[in-house]
Amino acid sequence: MKIDEFQGYLELDRSWQDSFLYPLSFQEYIYALAHDHGLNRTILLENAGYENKYNFLIVKRLIIRMYRQNQFILSTNDFQQNIFFASPQKIYSQVIAEVFSVIVEIPFSLRLLFSLEGKQIRKSHNLRSIHSIFPFLEDQFSHLNYVLDIRIPHPVHLEILVQTLRYWVKDAPSLHLLRFFLYESHNWNSFFSLKKNISFLKKRNQRFFLFLYNSHVCEYESIFFFICNQSSHLQSTFYGSLIERIHFYGKVEHLVKVFTKNFQVILWFFQDPLMHYVRYQGKSILASKATSLLINKWKYYLVNFWQCYFSVWSQPKRIYINQLSKNSLDFTGFLSSVCLNTSVVRSQMLENSFIMDNAINKFDTIVPSIPLIGSLSKAKFCNVLGHPISKPVWTDLSDSEIIDRFGXICRSISHYYSGSSKKTSLYRIKYILRLSCARTLARKHKSTVRSFLKRLGSEFLEEFFTEEEKVLSFLLPRDYSISQRLYRGRIWYLDIFCIHDFANHEWLVMRLSK
């Protein structure tokens, strides 16, 4: 690989990096734009800007103070007494963080527009939608052998993120402003002290930190994809000359004996293994049909790659090798596995008949009942064993509102996990929510669950049905076998746009139960 080609790839679409962004922080309309943008993203990020209020006077005072003082030369003693982060004026911190996140996204937006106009979108960028994950799992996983379950490492030093953005933004004052907020922010430790994945963020300055993390991952993936594409175009060695060479050295040295059955194993090192890369939140997978030896090489290559290119320390235990035929993969809230589905086929030719065993790999997705029950337990819908309990906090609400809340949680979970091939665990989750709702209503009216269910009848259960179940029960009320077969079919619904909540069970239940 030539150095100039590698540098040329890194400089691709960076023609907007010389833009001066810092003067925009002194423009009042940028603050209004950031505030409106935050309100529009409330559904996705649950962050309605800075306290849902746009105060023109606060913005005016902030810009005047930024003109008068140099806030980026700070001593240790002055750090806690800075005007941006003094106790009565913490809103300045949030205002500037919102504005900075809008300003610094400009080079990336211009780069996207430039790519669309010039039609320079690369193939690796075509399928970046979260909804493309599910068809990929269903179509490709049954043909793969190994999966690298990867937890993407985070930078151990704040300067690494600043260095990453320097490729795109060469505006020194903007980078100084970024350093200032990174070292000040109290959210930084909570953002990168991750237990399992990047799914838990504080509401304050959420968009700011989300942009920083995405820019870091984007830079890592751009270099990684380039190296993978270069390795996939390596020419394979012609097997005939390889066999003759091995035989020659075996005869001369008298040290090894080469058998024909070993040739195919050797040739794997000269063939394209057809790697598949999927990332979601702080977790990614690298799937392949390669051998165990080659997948181990990829594992240690990733560790060295992060250390050499990004100065990020990553331990090999953060990358787990999963053999799909033996273990399940926990990804996007599903337990995915590949099982061997055998079927007996009887074939008859003239007077002779043959019985053949036909084995087909089948992709299975299972609803993870234990994590979901644990999340329901933390949200006080059941105990740790999965026994439904009442929700005392909701007893002050009206009956219809209580039923609507329980029904919405049940329908959302059912809607997302409709792509599961085995829905036994899903039925148990529905049972917990239905009985918890009944016990909450019974507690409110000071009656028993049995008498309350008798009074409501089947109308109570219909509130927990999804729209698909209602349609099936209306169209096929008599043919039970057909309706059950249609309901048990695997259907991926692509109208779910907040999938990040569902991929994390605890975050999902806690969010919906508020």
Curated annotation (Swiss-Prot):
Keyword Phosphoprotein attributed: no
Record keywords, A-Z: Chloroplast, mRNA processing, Plastid, RNA-binding, tRNA processing
Keyword Nucleus: no
One GO-annotated biological process of the protein: tRNA processing
Subcellular locations according to the entry: Plastid, Chloroplast
Molecular functions per Gene Ontology: RNA binding
Top-level taxon of origin: Eukaryota
InterPro entries: Domain_X (IPR024937), Maturase_MatK (IPR002866), Maturase_MatK_N (IPR024942)
Role according to the record: Usually encoded in the trnK tRNA gene intron. Probably assists in splicing its own and other chloroplast group II introns.
HAMAP family given in the database record: MatK (MF_01390)
Family: Belongs to the intron maturase 2 family. MatK subfamily.
Protein name: Maturase K
The species this protein was found in: Drosophyllum lusitanicum (Portuguese sundew)
Gene behind this protein: matK
